[in-house]
Amino acid sequence: MAKIVQLPDDLSNKIAAGEVVERPASVVKELVENAIDANSSVIEIDVEEAGLASIKVLDDGEGMDAEDCRTAFLRHATSKIKDENDLFRVRTLGFRGEALPSIASVSHLSIKTSTGEGAGTHLTLQGGRIISEQKAPSRRGTEITVTNLFFNTPARLKYMKTIHTELGNITDVVNRIALAHPEVSIRLRHQGKTLLQTNGNGDVRHVLAAIYGTAVAKKMLPLEARSLDFEVKGYIALPEITRASRNYMSSVVNGRYIKNFPLVKAIHEGYHTLLPIGRHPITFIEINMDPLLVDVNVHPSKLEVRLSKETELHELIRDAIKDVFKQQQLIPSVQVPKKTAPLINKPEQQKLDFDQVREPAPLSDSDVEREYKPEPSFSAMKLSSLVKDPPPSAPVEREENVMQDTEPEWPGAEEYTPEAAPAVQAEPEQAGENVQDEETPKERVPIMYPIGQMHGTYILAQNENGLYIIDQHAAQERIKYEYFREKVGEVESEVQDLLVPLTFHYSKNEALTIDQHLDDLAKVGVFLESFGAGSYIVRCHPTWFPKGEETTIIEDIIQQVLDDRTIDIKKLREEAAIMMSCKGSIKANHHLRDDEITALLDELRRTSDPFTCPHGRPIIIHYSTYEMEKMFKRVM
């Protein structure tokens, strides 16, 4: 008797559902993508109990006739591809013909659909089997209702998370689809409460406002770049607006939301040292390319894709982001708190003019608390020989009735916990407001006249635009980082011979790795010579190694090689420069002379990125004259 048998269709569909339908969010994703493929302009999604009780998706798309409706629930039945050549030219979101039969096999499903010509079709299925077929109204479009999800797969139901978590997953999926298709009006409701409403006018900024709040959307900069193979566009948040999770970084390829680590890496490299360690930006990157350059047939969920010419795309995105920030003045301006106006309803957000001036969200007391709170002690400077006090500028008339944004910001897939978007302590000014196109990098930071030092840590300076507070350690870190970044690698002509060679010892396994990368280590100034089993000596080092730190620096660089196992010379030089700049910079509670402060500010202005230290912390904070006068009630 034969041992190998062909599985029945209902069992095959359940197996396929294990990959396609992982949770209620998977059902929502597949149904909404089908609606978009049907050229819908309006999609309404209603879920009960985070989709475990019911999911209903209603669209105004092309609909289906009775025959197509029945065929759609057969395995691998689709209208989107005809032959294997179409697999390499996929322009639709779906094409595998697995979603509907997989969903139907693990639920009770009802579908009403019509092409708008004649009566429609109403099918009812249980566990993938059609149990009734009736006529339906001729309204053009499709309505699918899924209930009792996973009723016949209790093991899958057992591993569902809490209602909040599953709803968070659904919200995350719908948010990303809405970003990828701003031309479609999408409404998501849970238990009758609207969670997302987009107007479908094609402007992705309005979708960003609906998802992240208007204050965040107004602080996002447009991004555009082209090459022979790729067209990249989207919006990237100013560096001050960060999150602890990567879930706020959305990438879309040919209208399909994807997860791709190399793209995330390219975005981080574009921000470079503008981001604090462990923080991630809010970004939306849309990439259009020839379908031949992307393989979407990698996984049934179609979230993972393979990209051709990935290195070229990586460089295009990274350089485009860098170019955007090179044109911006990124000095954060602290704003005076003001009374919070009533909340704006989500649908009204779609009507906001993005060119209007807005005040940032108000600061709470906790936002401005400092860990270091001694009695004020200022070291005053005699400035009469340097510069006269700038004349007080007339306060600029500002719109006082601008509504503050306190809209909730929907989280990513980890947990659904709606809460007000946190106020950013130091919101930068709207991009491009104070920056002229013809400015050089030196003019990105204005000339500042020092007036003192606070706690031996912060430099106070002024000009006609107000007060500036400079973190002296972060400022010198940036200066030294850019110096060392240029010096690392220029080692051949600038070396210091040692009277007594430095000796280093490693295990046999570590020595094998080091031996493979001796040439790479030499390129960053570490000249190792074998000195027995697992031992090495260094007879010279670059003259720019910080004095007294030579042994530590060499050990740290070698450890980077041992940790990574593979060498990226550019990355190694970068890490070495960051390490040396941090070790050699002035620390807190270090009082500087007047001439030292002036020299430090002049050197900072000459750096290419004078706004953050190499670790992403801000260097300069700005209080405008208007805000100072407002705090002292000189203006109301």
From Swiss-Prot:
Gene3D superfamilies on file: 3.30.230.10, Histidine kinase-like ATPase, C-terminal domain (3.30.565.10), MutL, C-terminal domain, dimerisation subdomain (3.30.1540.20), MutL, C-terminal domain, regulatory subdomain (3.30.1370.100)
Biological process terms from the Gene Ontology for this record are: mismatch repair
> What domain of life?
Bacteria
- Transferase listed as a keyword: no
A GO-annotated cellular component:
mismatch repair complex
- Where do transmembrane segments lie in this chain? none
**InterPro entries according to UniProt:** DNA_mismatch_repair_CS, DNA_mismatch_repair_MutL, DNA_mismatch_S5_2-like, HATPase_C_sf, MutL/Mlh/PMS, MutL/Mlh/Pms-like, MutL_C, MutL_C_dimsub
Question: Key word Nucleotide-binding present in the record?
Answer: no
Residues annotated as region Disordered?
341-420
Residue ranges annotated as compositionally biased, kind Basic and acidic residues, are 348-358
Which terms are listed as keywords in the entry?
A: DNA damage, DNA repair
Return one GO MF term.
Answer: ATP binding
The record describes the protein's role as:
This protein is involved in the repair of mismatches in DNA. It is required for dam-dependent methyl-directed DNA mismatch repair. May act as a 'molecular matchmaker', a protein that promotes the formation of a stable complex between two or more DNA-binding proteins in an ATP-dependent manner without itself being part of a final effector complex.
PANTHER family the UniProt entry points to: DNA MISMATCH REPAIR PROTEIN MLH, PMS, MUTL, DNA MISMATCH REPAIR PROTEIN MLH1
Q: According to its UniProt record, which protein family does this protein belong to?
A: Belongs to the DNA mismatch repair MutL/HexB family.
- Identification of the protein by name: DNA mismatch repair protein MutL
Give the species. Answer: Bacillus licheniformis (strain ATCC 14580 / DSM 13 / JCM 2505 / CCUG 7422 / NBRC 12200 / NCIMB 9375 / NCTC 10341 / NRRL NRS-1264 / Gibson 46)
Q: State the gene name recorded for this protein.
A: mutL
